[in-house]
């Protein structure tokens, strides 16, 4: 791997981007995206108590490191009990960090804390810095799923449509909405929306894509 990094590290490069396989489907890659945590020895600092990211102290120049893949194999025996408190700490330290607001709202949804999920994800959408359409659509999908879990299907439908309109180039909004309609016996609607999902043929290399 060192040779691949050195080949990409031309003059002026301070940060490297590489293929990161976050999950696996048997021997195949599941969720994958470009990660960027290879950086120069100086000029960067790490922030956040969880979902750590690196931020440059000044100008930076990144390069794609071709042929380098990092595989993520989480330890299933390791407790995740501290994860939610650390996310809450991250948001309390920097309430205007849109990424952490999304992560916290998503975690509330995963924990079945649906009212808190709706509140925090709505706050994420209202932040001026929350401009990444894929992530905004993901927040809308989790809001929709929370409303559905609370038995409010009309509100869930509204948010699924909003998610699709926010990021029509992502499969996930249309797929999730189709799955809900199928479960409710609305087969015509499910077919319509699953075809919307199938019409998206290019997968984005972001962590949102599943």
Language-model features and meaning:
Residues 79, 97, 136, 170, ...:
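Residues that mark the junctions of alpha-helical repeat units in TPR/alpha-solenoid scaffolds
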Residues 81-84, 88-91, 118, 125, ...:
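Tetratricopeptide repeat
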Residues 1-119:
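Catalytic-site signature of metal-activated, phosphate-bearing donor transferases
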